[in-house]
Amino acid sequence: MAIMTKYLPACAGVLLSFSAAAYGQQMASVTLDSKTIMVEYTAPAANNRISGSFHTPADLAFKGLNVPKGLYTLYVLTDGPRWQLAINKATGQEAATYDPKQDLGRVPMLMIRPPAPVSACKFTLAKIAPIAAELQVVCSDKAASTSFRLDRGANDSQW
């Protein structure tokens, strides 16, 4: 029996099914050690998809995944009660359709309950330590988060 996986993409570039003017371009950013990490996305209604891009000017470390500096597409895989963040190498119009073969990797997300339901999906980035941040995705009455840090190697004692 096949398991269906739903996803909320944060696709780089123009996604033909949404107009930036219709939903408004949104941006979340956080600065860690003078490096600004950004997620740019379009925020449609909570039952639609999120589109945007993930840019990091520094190497990052998520739980079990090192992400070299660069431009990526984020997809939130919402398979039942547990969500995963897929960091995908496809950008621009190539990112309009999710291709798991292009994943750099996936990280687990912690499910949390937002304080109140939202009408539009959104990403937030919040600094949690001098070189660490939390990425949160809120959509309708569900939310998930994962943390990351600047990747300074295995001897980094600031994490």
Per-range role (PLM):
Residues 1-11:
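Bacterial N-terminal signal peptides that target proteins for export
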Residues 3, 69-70:
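Short charge-dense sequence patches
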Residues 19-20, 41:
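Residue-level recognition of conserved structural "scaffold" positions that shape functional pockets
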Residues 29-69, 75-159:
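Extended, well-structured beta-strand/loop surface patches
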